[in-house]
Each structure stands twice: as structure tokens, then as C-alpha cells.
């Protein structure tokens, strides 16, 4: 369970999040809203990349507000960036071992790659460099998160910068993660297909919460108001 209590965040004289209070308690939650609504800021606050100006953040009842990124990672929080980092000179197997916190066998690493739809023999010894596409990198990143076995996995707009074929594969990966999830998954996204596989949807606009509830209640309203009138929180 993740809880925001009166959380605000300001930068450069601008209020980006304003007194946000919400409890995310389902296995798979999606956060959506127009550009500049505070979605990515909320994700970075969860991961500890930035600290709130005001308010507190709790995970499973523990105050994590002042924890560093490392401490949050050790507490079971993982974060996937919009653009995964490339590591020249490090193989996919090495990266999975680093994520798992132990030396993984070839069989174990191959299992994690297979879970995200990658042919293990084609990737296990490849370097995580510019030869990999955006879609391949994102799936390798998800394999790392699965290897780590985190309590809370946060994905910031995972569909960004990938082609349609890679996106379709990514949807299948998230559907499988949803079915097998041992922890919470939070995805920041605009994509209807991602929103449609969430348990709950949180809608942000102008730094505040417009709506939050079960997917079956919130999703139809989002589809009816793509003109923008839904996102009118002052």
C-alpha cells in the first residue's frame, strides 16, 4: 500500500503538485492526465528522485519521505525511466545479476528474459548499448525488475519512444505481470490500452486529483471526454 498525505511539490516558483492525498492499494494502478499535470513528478517522488516540498509519503505504513533512492530500492521500490539507460561494456546477464543482488545462472537469466518475450539466446550475452532498440531496452529493464522481486514497481510512460510492434509486445508483458504480480505496479501513461488493464486509475490535472477509482468506473469517463473538459481542476 502506498499513501500520499497532503503532498505538494514546487520547483522554479511553480506549484507542480498541490496537497495530494491518496492511497494506492491495488496490485496494478495507472496514473494519467494531460501533459504537465504532475504525473512524472508523482513517480519521481515515489522513487525518491525528488523530495516533496510538503507532506509525507508512506509505504505499508512506513514513512519513506526522507529515505534516499538507495534506501527505497532496498525497501523494495523500483523505478523504470521513460528512456532506459544504456550500459556499454555490460552484458544483459550482468545487468540482471546486478538487479537480483546476486550472481544469477544462465538458466535464471534466460527465464527472466523469456518472461518479457525476449529470446534468451539472442540477448543473454549482448551488451546493453546502442545496438538495442527502445522496445528491447524497456523489456530488459522489466526483466531486471522481475529479477529484483520488488514490492512496488513504478513505470514512467513506458510507451515513450517505441514503435507499434514493440508497444504491442510491451502490453503483453504488462498483462502477464498483472496476472502474476506479487507486489504493486504503478504505471504513468496516456495509452488507453495500458489504462484498460489497470485495476484502478488515478487522474491528475493542474497538480491535483480529478478522479480516482476502479478502472470500470473511471475509464469510460476518460474515453468520453478526450476533448479536455474532464481535466478542469483549479
State the predicted function of each range.
Residues 2-4, 15-19:
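Conserved structural motif at the start of ABC-family nucleotide-binding domains
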Residues 32-34:
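The feature captures the beta-strand-to-loop junction immediately N-terminal to the Walker
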Residues 47:
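Helix-to-loop junction immediately C-terminal to a conserved catalytic motif
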Residues 55-62, 108:
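Conserved ABC transporter NBD signature motif
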Residues 63-78, 222:
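ABC ATPase NBD coupling module
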Residues 83, 89-105:
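Q-loop/switch helix immediately C-terminal to the Walker
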Residues 154-158, 165:
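Walker B catalytic motif
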Residues 208-231:
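Conserved beta-strand-loop-alpha-helix hinge in the C-terminal portion
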